[in-house]
Amino acid sequence: MEAARRDSIDFFLGATTPAGFKGYFEPLRREPGMQMYLIKSGPGCGKSTLMKRLARAAEQRGELTQRIHCASDPDSLDGVILPGQHRAIVDATAPHVVEPDAPGADEVVVSLYHTIDAEKLHQCTDEVKALFARNALLRSRAARYIASAGSLLLDSRRTEACSANFDKVRRYVKRLCTRVMPRTEGIGSEELRLLSAVTPKGEVFYQGTAQALADKFIVFRDDYGAVSRLLLELIRAEALTRGYHIITCPCAMHPEDKIDHILIPELKLAFLTDNRWHPVHLPSVQAVRCTRFLDRENLAAYRARLRFNERAAAELLEQASALMAQAKSCHDELETYYRAAVDFGKVDEAAAECMEMFGLK
């Protein structure tokens, strides 16, 4: 594994959620002025290596570089984003297929299919198709475990919500934002990224990204998510209204309706949610225990149910990660067939062309 540097900016741009695979490649495409470079190739054909090479070159030049990791294999990259250039290069193959809307204008297709000896690979058709099918089966089973865990965690969040004083939350956010986010003349804007995901290694949380982009941390400790959900939703609205560019990080388990973290690089400020799934361990944080917004006596009546949900969800996610690890092993075997049929000299030539397109040669 390529070790993440202390100041490395790492995200996911897609993950398996209770609703299936959720990707943020389309929102990335819609970011103002963004030009996308779409890599097309097979497994094990050098896509991630090409992007790692580009990321290293950009970082050596001092460019702000976002590394986008693959949730199915966090050691591999699904993309690299250079915000200063308004450019991104991404793996545009399944499960996050991206096709050009305006080829050459908004998107450039970087095809590596010409590097594959199709005749050689054709000799292994049965083995390759069987591995693709087994990989899909294992990923589908993992998704069902994640869906079951998500159902329990949602039940816990709704249970906590019945004991929450949301008016108190709203008043708190108004005071907090007045103190830490002065109004600006700018127009608010937003990037969508994931800071955590369920992976073959368990739940991976890129806490170092917050450290790279901020030096002030407001951390909401919330075991079940009902209070932090509203806190982050209101903070997002305030930040955009006050004219800031923000990086919004949805919850990997419920990305459609829950935000876990918000980063405001301009203020060097991060709002983070701390819980069992992504514990925050940072020095000098302003810690806010969300129990202050709860009727704890009322919530205590549901303690056994909440504990059961947490234990069961943890076991389900552990099984999901184990299945994802099996899927990764299957994918690794699949890559051996492709690697044997790839001309990596041609891949190196394509990588050099990409470096030139990004002005990094």
Spans of model-derived segments:
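N-terminal pre-Walker A segment at the start of P-loop NTPase domains
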Residues: 1-28, 167-210
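Conserved nucleotide-sensing/catalytic segment adjacent to the nucleotide-binding pocket
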Residues: 2-21, 56-120, 126-127, 239-318
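N-terminal low-complexity, Ser/Thr/acidic repeat segments characteristic of secreted
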Residues: 7, 35, 182-186, 216, ...
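A cross-family "folded-core" feature that marks the main globular domain of proteins
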Residues: 39-40, 50-51, 58, 66-69, ...
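An accessory alpha-helical subdomain
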Residues: 127-179, 308, 312-357
